[in-house]
A protein has these predicted regions:
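Short, Lys/Arg-enriched segments at the junction into DNA-binding effector domains
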Residues: 10-15, 126-158
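The feature encodes the CheY-like receiver
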Residues: 24, 67, 95, 113
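Charged docking surfaces used in two-component/phosphorelay signaling
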Residues: 25-33
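Acidic, metal-coordinating helix/loop segments flanking the phosphotransfer/catalytic sites
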Residues: 40-59
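Conserved phosphotransfer cores of two-component systems
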Residues: 52-55, 77-84, 105
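Active-site residues of response regulator receiver
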Residues: 63, 91
């Protein structure tokens, strides 16, 4: 089984928004074993409420095909409300146009069903690392970084 990243003083909260009961039960079990705290929403409206609730989840796993809204619509609504929580779209939509649509809507990563649990866990860990690295929490590799220089461009990160 995969390991969580080392700096893990608190449990990572994942919101899983999917209406497939068997899949959510399997994912909840796997994520629990990995040490994540999982909350499930079986429709988009409930997922939207939980995504905006305090404290916000640390990561969101969002299905495209929900009974009331599309995952893309939910993602757009989450983003328009100012929530920056990393979102992974978990879907059967394997078309490039669908991937682009989801990424343009604000999804951070995209995983096509069927998928391997190992790949899902690796993607969640990567999203978690990116979120910690840019959150200013002091946990990221470059947490003390004041300036970022790329080519002729220099950015003050403070």
């Amino acid at each position: 089984m995969a390991q969580l990243p080392e700096p893990s003083d608190q449990t990572i909260r994942i919101l899983l928004v999917d209406d497939e009961v068997r899949l959510t039960e399997l994912l909840r079990l796997e994520l629990d074993v990995e040490g994540y705290d999982v909350e499930v929403a079986s429709d988009g409206a409930t997922g939207l409420i939980k995504a905006r609730s305090q404290p916000e989840p640390d990561l969101i796993v969002l299905d495209w095909n929900l009974p009331d809204f599309s995952g893309v619509d939910i993602c757009q609504r989450i983003r328009s409300s100012g929530v920056t929580t990393p979102i992974l779209m978990l879907t059967g939509h394997d078309d490039i146009a669908d991937r682009v649509k989801a990424l343009d809507a604000g999804v951070d990563d995209y995983l096509v069903k069927p998928f391997s649990i190992e790949e899902l866990m690796a993607r969640l860990r990567a999203m978690q690392r990116r979120a910690q690295g840019f959150s200013g929490s002091g946990q990221g590799k470059d947490a003390g970084l004041t300036f970022l220089a790329v080519g002729g461009l220099t950015i003050n990160t403070q």
